[in-house]
Structure formats: structure tokens, C-alpha cells
């Protein structure tokens, strides 16, 4: 069994819900760790007013007993406190309020309304909103729990806000991770964070928004997770697809993937072996992936987030109802959400890694999966 899930819910609806299937029985779930990731997603310099309203927490409804997975589908919900302020506008039982027709460039509003034959883009934007990533993060926390049991850890770091970008080539150390988690910009360099805050403040003052980039890392992965056999089984393709499925992510880089101007001997990673360490590399330009499979080095992927298209200083658009020129409608939004996106990035990467590991090692009980991973690691040494 591999992992799969479905989610439902609107940004200002009663709740975001998910059903996940495929987790082996006996996995210990730390509910506080799940809620901690939800709180991490709410943090970040440049966030909007919504995060002052919500206090996100996951309510588990099925698939666990006494903090352990049972092997049955897991159901969970993240409730929207802000629904109380929107219940007359966003309700399964009635339609109210002014129609949203001043569609916003950069959003799903126009294409979604035309595709589904809607005269009110509210039905599009409520589902397309990045608010849905709250339940994504809760699902990712479950995947992290499975990965941790198998010796794999996932973390992230913001590496760019606006044009100011850094290129760390290794996962953060424990001390750096502590600094990252303490930072309102999810970075371990306070001088750099101060520069970034100034950029965010400048965009806020002009009624704009600003994007950036983040790295996601995974350590402890064995060699050979993923496959070279078919394109849809290549782990790099799956990770890129998962990250590009996150709202506002426009590009993904694996390792030093954009540095293709280097000659080959400066781009690839020489292979070494010794009995104690097994196979190893002294560089990690590939970012832990070769030929669609993990190569035993730390995974490193970078995702690029566009500036949020909802802005106080709006762009020109067309009214969906009249086809007349107008200004895009403003909805409460963030100036910068890159730190939050990094936490979402962790979640989707963790999910894909957990799925790929279960594909390879199988098992209906966690202990079966763990033993299979250990036996494989011993074989390839």
C-alpha cells in the first residue's frame, strides 16, 4: 500500500478536512508535533491579519487509537475560526453577499470561473486559497512521523526574499535549526533577516508584495529510493510536482540544478567507498538525487515563490460580469509568505519521501517497514 489523500474545504468555510490512507499500523503520532507544525506555518514577518484570528490545531477523527495508527484511513480536520465572520457569505446552505467579479491577475479567479461556468469567482478563490495548506501541513506532519521512525529527518530554510539570495550547500546544523525556528524569517542569519525585513517593509508601504525562495532538506535517506525506470516514478519529478502544486510556487531546483554553466567535472559528485561508511561523496551538487533516485547524500531542493498577487495597489483587470476594464479587487492577504511556504514545502516533500519509502519497503506494520529498511541498508553497504 502506498500513501494517498484527499482534502476538502474552503478558505472561509467551517473547516479543512482530509482523509489519508496507507499509513502502516503502529505509528506513534505526537499530536503536539502536528500542532507545532501548524503554528510554524502561521509564523513569519509579512503575514496578514488572518493569522491573528486563527489558532490552528488538528482534530483527528479516525484511524488512530491511543496515539497509534491502526492501519485504517486517517481522518482529520483543521477548523477555521474566521468562518464565524464569513458564514453568511461562505455557506453550504445559502449564497449571499456581493459577487466577486473583479478577478485578480496572478490568481485562479478568471480561469477557474470561465472553466466551471461561474458568475462569481468567490467559488474559485475560496478553494484555490493557500489557506488549504493548513491541512497539507497536518498531513505532512504524519509523514514526518513515519520518516523519523525510519531515521529520516526533514527541515527547511528560507534562502531568498526578493533579489537577495543565498546558496548554503548543506543542511542546517542543530544549532542553525534552532536559530531558524527562532527567526521570523526562517533563516539563521539575523543580519540577512534585517535586510529582508526592510525589503518587506518597503513593499508593504507601496501596497505591493514580495516573493522569495526556500530550501527543503532531508537527511538519513538510503541509496535507491525512487526509480530510473519510468518518468513518473523518478523521485526528482515527483518532488518537483509536489512543490509546484503548492500555491504560488513557480519553479523548483534540485541540488545545484540551475548552475549548468559549470563544466562537468565541477557539476557532478565523485563516488567513494570504505567499509565503515559505505558509499559516500565529498560534494553534494546533485542534491542527493541521481537518475531519479536518492544517492545517499542529503536531499536538497529549492522552491521559488512568486510575490502574492493580491495587493493593496492592484493591477488592471476586467470585470467578469461586464467585461469592462477595472481594478483587481483586494482581499485580505500577506505581503510576504515565504517562511510559511517553507513549512508547507517540508510537508509535501515529507509526504513524497514517505510514499516512496513505503513503495520500496512495504509493510502493514511500522516494525515490518523498519526491519526492511535495515536489511536493505545492510545489503547495499
Curated annotation (Swiss-Prot):
GO MF term (any one): FMN binding
Residues binding FMN, per UniProt: 127-129, 247-248, 291, 306-310, 332
Pathway: Metabolic intermediate biosynthesis; chorismate biosynthesis; chorismate from D-erythrose 4-phosphate and phosphoenolpyruvate: step 7/7
Annotated EC: 4.2.3.5
Gene Ontology CC: one annotated term: cytosol
PROSITE patterns assigned: CHORISMATE_SYNTHASE_2, CHORISMATE_SYNTHASE_3
Gene Ontology annotations of biological process type: amino acid biosynthetic process; aromatic amino acid family biosynthetic process; chorismate biosynthetic process
Reactions catalysed: 5-O-(1-carboxyvinyl)-3-phosphoshikimate = chorismate + phosphate
Cofactor note: Reduced FMN (FMNH(2)).
Residues at which NADP(+) binds: 41, 47
Cofactor(s) of this protein: FMNH2
Lyase found in the keyword field: yes
Lyase is among the record's keywords: yes
Enzyme class name: lyase
InterPro entries xref list: Chorismate_synth (IPR000453), Chorismate_synth_AroC_sf (IPR035904), Chorismate_synthase_CS (IPR020541)
Similarity annotation: Belongs to the chorismate synthase family.
Biological role: This reaction introduces a second double bond into the aromatic ring system.
HAMAP family with a match to the protein in the record: Chorismate_synth (MF_00300)
Record note on quaternary structure: Homotetramer.
Protein name: Chorismate synthase
